[in-house]
Structure formats: structure tokens, C-alpha cells
């Protein structure tokens, strides 16, 4: 069984006669759903319906299709793994920008559920990266908006405060210390070791080599 969709949305699919049943595929506009060794022969049609009726970006629609497959019984061998790869429609030559999602769940009792959680976390980190780029370009307000989006997707406990910590560091580096302090404090509330780590950043060039500044940041984290 093989399926291909090119960048223009053209599809080519083949399900061979020796694929283990239930096996089959369905092709739609710009997509293909295929499966083999399924418990029921309703899986690929259910995937297609879910994909077409769902909203959101490509990752969200693919997850909807996977969930629909599981609802029809999924793989007759049971559940174990799931994966998703999504790349930008137009490449920049910079892999870290073009590969939007590249996630795998190798062994889990609920692989699609776990993959869905990881996609949500990746969305948060994608928003963090966008915020960093805005701040680096001097568009701090746009950066703050992206950071808020990121932290709404990833609660502090989901990252042990790391997302909030690096937001704070980026704002300190941009000279926005008062705005950085609440984020750093959020990180500290999750794990007090963030106060130790911030003191190590000047040696790596990530913050100014200013002991008074570091002392102030640590003090504000601990308030």
C-alpha cells in the first residue's frame, strides 16, 4: 500500500490485493486516507469524513482523522504508536522553520491522545519561537502577543516553568525588565532552580554580564 500527495495536491494511491484486511483507501481533494490491517473496513471512509468536516490547520485535521480511525476500531493488533509530520507549503531552506511538526509516539496506551498533547505543546513552542523573532526584530509588542498565545497553549506546569522562563529572558535582553519579572516569577514558582540558572546565562552571552542585574532578577523571581 502506498499513497502520495504532491505540493499541488495531486494524489496517487494503490492498495495491493495482498494487503492484510481490512485494507483500503479513499482519495479527496488534496488528500488521501489509507489503512491496512484494520479491525473494520469502515476506517478510511471515517478518516476522510473527519478530515473534511474538521476545522483548523493541517495538523488538527490529521489528528481528527486519526481519532476517527480509532473510533472505528483502528488497528486489529491494538494501539501502540502514532506520528505526524507537517512541513511548510513553501520551503525556506531552513529546516527549523519549515518543519512545523515532527512528532512520534513510539509506545503508549493511548498514542493518538498522546500525539494530540504533543502537537499542542509544539504549537506553544512554535509561538514562542515567533515571539523571539519579533522581539529580536524590535517588535516587542508583537512578541508579547505571541508569548501570551504560547503560554495559553502550554500551562506553566506543562513545561516546569521553562516557557515562562525563556519569555522572561528574552524580555530582559530587550531591556523590558518590568515586563519580564512576572514571567520569571512564574517559572520560579514551578521550580526554584530557575533562579540558579539565570545566573549562569551571562557566561553564555544570553544576558548582560551585570551582577547587579542578575541579583535584581533573582530577587524579583523570589518575591
Predicted regions and their residues:
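Alpha-helical junction/boundary sensor with strong preference for TPR arrays
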Residues: 154, 190-191
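TPR/TPR-like alpha-solenoid helical repeat scaffolds
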Residues: 161-166, 193-218
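N-terminal nucleophile
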Residues: 1-126, 137, 158
